[in-house]
Amino acid sequence: MTTGDCCHLPGSLCDCSGSPAFSKVVEATGLGPPQYVAQVTSRDGRLLSTVIRALDTPSDGPFCRICHEGANGECLLSPCGCTGTLGAVHKSCLEKWLSSSNTSYCELCHTEFAVEKRPRPLTEWLKDPGPRTEKRTLCCDMVCFLFITPLAAISGWLCLRGAQDHLRLHSQLEAVGLIALTIALFTIYVLWTLVSFRYHCQLYSEWRKTNQKVRLKIREADSPEGPQHSPLAAGLLKKVAEETPV
């Protein structure tokens, strides 16, 4: 991942103040105090996150790098090798991020997380199979299946009854024609059912691979209740100690 012309998210301004893009952003904000804008993008250019923070406003404490909220409702963790404000993250936010991005590592420091992936149930796929075209195709195929199945069964039964009647009347040509029609009807029905079923099974398999429930396994060293301080907490304590006047 990259952060435009800056390698850090808000809060780590030491390496960003000298860049031209940073100065342009600060001067362009004429309303209120100067602000710092950070845009986190992936390697393919997709915008993943944008944060705007005032430069002259001191931070109240560490905040989650995904939702940019503090530790009021949920404790902040430091599960990867990122330090500073990049190292703090909520467990729920990170699980949602890993689930939506279909990854199991930090996209900044490439640290592999210990995760447990569980496939989502079939009912969720039936409610939301993906794009609108796939949803429309699924609904149409289900309606056609419910309509064609009894129609094919009734048509086949009528053809067989007619073939029996023609055999009793010694009309073998008509009986053979009705039997051939029944076989053709059921062949087309079975082929259409198999093709449609295979197509939707492939869609469900792809959806299942990219839509999984990710559960982050927290190690003792990453937990805020562990015996040792995390790198984030150690850095904050060191910073506070340096800024405290003697």
Swiss-Prot record:
Its EC number is 2.3.2.27. Residues 56-116 are annotated as: Required for inhibition of HIV-1 virus production and VSV G protein expression. It is found in: Endoplasmic reticulum membrane; Lysosome membrane; Endosome membrane; Golgi apparatus membrane. Induction: (Microbial infection) Induced by HIV-1 infection. Interacts with STX6; the interaction promotes MARCHF2-mediated ubiquitination and degradation of CFTR. Interacts with MARCHF3. Interacts with GOPC/CAL; the interaction leads to CFTR ubiquitination and degradation. Interacts with CFTR; the interaction leads to CFTR ubiqtuitination and degradation. Interacts (via PDZ domain) with DLG1 (via PDZ domains); the interaction leads to DLG1 ubiqtuitination and degradation. Interacts with ERGIC3. Interacts with ADRB2. E3 ubiquitin-protein ligase that may mediate ubiquitination of TFRC and CD86, and promote their subsequent endocytosis and sorting to lysosomes via multivesicular bodies. E3 ubiquitin ligases accept ubiquitin from an E2 ubiquitin-conjugating enzyme in the form of a thioester and then directly transfer the ubiquitin to targeted substrates. Together with GOPC/CAL mediates the ubiquitination and lysosomal degradation of CFTR. Ubiquitinates and therefore mediates the degradation of DLG1. (Microbial infection) Positively regulates the degradation of Vesicular stomatitis virus (VSV) G protein via the lysosomal degradation pathway. Represses HIV-1 viral production and may inhibit the translocation of HIV-1 env to the cell surface, resulting in decreased viral cell-cell transmission. GO terms for cellular component: cytoplasm; cytoplasmic vesicle; cytosol; endoplasmic reticulum; endoplasmic reticulum membrane; endosome membrane; Golgi membrane; lysosomal membrane. Changing W97A: Reduces ubiquitination of DLG1. No effect on interaction with DLG1. Abolishes ubiquitination of and interaction with DLG1. Zn(2+) 1 binds at C64, C67, H90, C93. Keywords: Cell membrane, Cytoplasm, Endocytosis, Endoplasmic reticulum, Endosome, Golgi apparatus, Lysosome, Membrane, Metal-binding, Transferase, Transmembrane, Transmembrane helix, Ubl conjugation pathway, Zinc, Zinc-finger. Broadly expressed. Zn(2+) 2 binds at C80, C82, C106, C109. This is E3 ubiquitin-protein ligase MARCHF2. It comes from Homo sapiens. One of its GO terms (molecular function) is ubiquitin-protein transferase activity. Residues 121-246 are annotated as: Required for interaction with IKBKG. It is a multi-pass membrane protein. InterPro entries: Znf_RING, Znf_RING-CH, Znf_RING/FYVE/PHD. Gene3D superfamilies: Zinc/RING finger domain, C3HC4 (zinc finger). GO terms for biological process: antibacterial innate immune response; antiviral innate immune response; endocytosis; positive regulation of lysosomal protein catabolic process; protein ubiquitination; suppression of viral release by host. CDD domains: RING_CH-C4HC3_MARCH2.
